[in-house]
Amino acid sequence: MLQQFPMSAYIPVADVARARQFYEQKLGFKPGREVGGGGVTYQFADGTSCVMYPTPNAGTSRASQAFWQVDDVEREVAELRARGVKFEEYDMPGLKTKDGIATGGGAKAAWFKDTEGNIMAIVQSLTSPVAAKRKRPVANARRAR
C-alpha cells in the first residue's frame, strides 16, 4: 500500500546553520525549499528526499539515521575524506571496519557522523543487479561550488 509512494527521511539537527554547512559543503547537497522552524529539504535520486529540522534531540540515536546506496564505496569514501568527512571505525562482534569500510552480508558499508552527532552510512551492494547498472553522475557535477 504505502510502497507505491515516495518516502522521505528526517535529519534532526541542533544547529541548522552548522548542519547545513556540513551537508552542503562537505557532502555536496543542494538545498531545496525551506520549511518551518528553519529546516530545509534536499532531493535525491529516484524521488527520495530528506528534511533537516531543528530539535534538541539531535544526535541521540545510536543507530544510523540514513544511508545512501552507492556503486563504489571506496571511491565515495575517498572523495568524502578529501572534503573533510571522518569515517567511523568499528571492531565488535559482527562488525569490523578496515580503513572505515566493513564488508559482509553481500555489501560494503562505511559510516560517518554529521556535525550534530547523527550516524550516516554509505552502502554498496555486492549482489544487486540494479546497483551494477546504476550510472553515477559525473563527480564534478555533484560537488558544491
Describe each model-derived feature in a short phrase.
Residues 15-17, 66-119, 125-130, 144-145:
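Vicinal oxygen chelate
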